[in-house]
Amino acid sequence: MPVSHRILLSLKEAAKVIGTQGNSIQSVRDNNNNVKIGISEKVPGCSDRVLTCSGEVEDVCSALGDVVTLLNKPSENEEETDNHHFYFLNHLLPVPTLDDLKATDPEASEEALHEQLQNIGYLRLLVFNSQLSSIIGKGGNQIKSLIEKHGVKLVASRAFLPDSTERMLEIQGVPSAIKQVLLDICEIIAKEEEEEEKARAENNNGESTGRKRFERKYYPHLQRNNTNSSSNNGSVGNSANSQEYTATVMIPESYVGALAGKKGNRLANLRKFTKTKILMESRPNDLDNEHEDENDMEEDDGRLRKFTIIGSSSRSVNLAESMLQRNLATEIERRKERLRNLSENNESA
């Protein structure tokens, strides 16, 4: 089964994976001949790059295990911890200690524990929010099972990466364990997609959840607001003169009504809570664009509406952006669940 995984890297990490004259990344290709692996171009002013690895499941997971090994290799003058301006590059999980390892394996020798500690690494896996819901599972049962089964640590970012529907799943463990947990993650995602396709095919109304059409990948970039002032590659742009921060979120047409709420109340509450202005792009020939029908689920042929968030602080704009994306993800999941129920009712009829 072919898969493609994307990993978020800092500039230092990307340089380490590439190696002198590309030798390190070439060694990963040589060890896993059936994968395509590459790193996005360096964007001036951005502190991150994205590694993409594609191929058969086993080969891709094995190659990413090799990437963890490369990242674990110490570099000259490398600081133990780097603090990054870009939130997603800072580790979500605490650095493991000898005491942590002793607690899980009290019989192990000091030498063995030191060796194990040196082998523990990280991967920042980029995952669509819809897929992450399946990985976490109901009540977090699925992700707990993965942690216990493979002896790794897993944590997901609450926020979406800028201008995307992706979140970060950080994996901490030894390379072999990270490889195994990635194999299970691939299986979970494949099973979920298979069930969704089956439910869609069996649904007499042919209703789409809109999941795949509106997934948006993250790419390293600098955002700009209407005054063309650039920002760090966080999730907002800003104007130095007015201290005004902005962000844009693209929402599928068929979900606009649900996110606006009855007579725009849901959007009004979001504005009030985050202390931001949220401007919704009008539909063509639509003068009353705030009063959308929250139950409108008409197919939209991929049309998107732009929501512009404006605030006096990056924190409030980030909060509004994240909450808007989360509301969209919740609505997509709600419609997905309704589709499943329709399919189950059809089977029992």
Curated annotation (Swiss-Prot):
Source domain of life: Eukaryota
Entry keyword Zinc: no
Stretches for region Disordered: 194-214
InterPro entries named in the record: KH_dom, KH_dom_type_1, KH_dom_type_1_sf
Keywords for this protein: Chromatin regulator, Chromosome, Cytoplasm, mRNA transport, Nucleus, Repeat, RNA-binding, Telomere, Translation regulation, Transport
GO cellular component, one term: chromosome, telomeric region
Main location: cytoplasm
Pfam families in alphabetical order: KH_1 (PF00013)
GO molecular function, a single term: mRNA binding
Cellular compartments annotated: Cytoplasm; Cytoplasm, P-body; Nucleus; Chromosome, Telomere
Domain KH: 2-67, 120-185, 244-324
Record-linked SUPFAM superfamilies: Eukaryotic type KH-domain (KH-domain type I)
Gene3D superfamilies per the UniProt record, alphabetical: K Homology domain, type 1
Biological process terms in GO annotation: chromatin organization; intracellular mRNA localization; mRNA stabilization; mRNA transport; regulation of translation; telomere maintenance via telomerase
Primary role: RNA-binding protein involved in the correct localization of transcripts in the cell. RNA localization is a widespread mechanism for achieving localized protein synthesis. Involved in structural and functional organization of telomeric chromatin and regulates silencing at the HMR locus.
Protein family per UniProt: Belongs to the HEK2 family.
Subunit structure: Binds RNA.
Official protein name in the record: Heterogeneous nuclear rnp K-like protein 2
The organism of origin for this protein: Candida glabrata (strain ATCC 2001 / BCRC 20586 / JCM 3761 / NBRC 0622 / NRRL Y-65 / CBS 138) (Yeast)
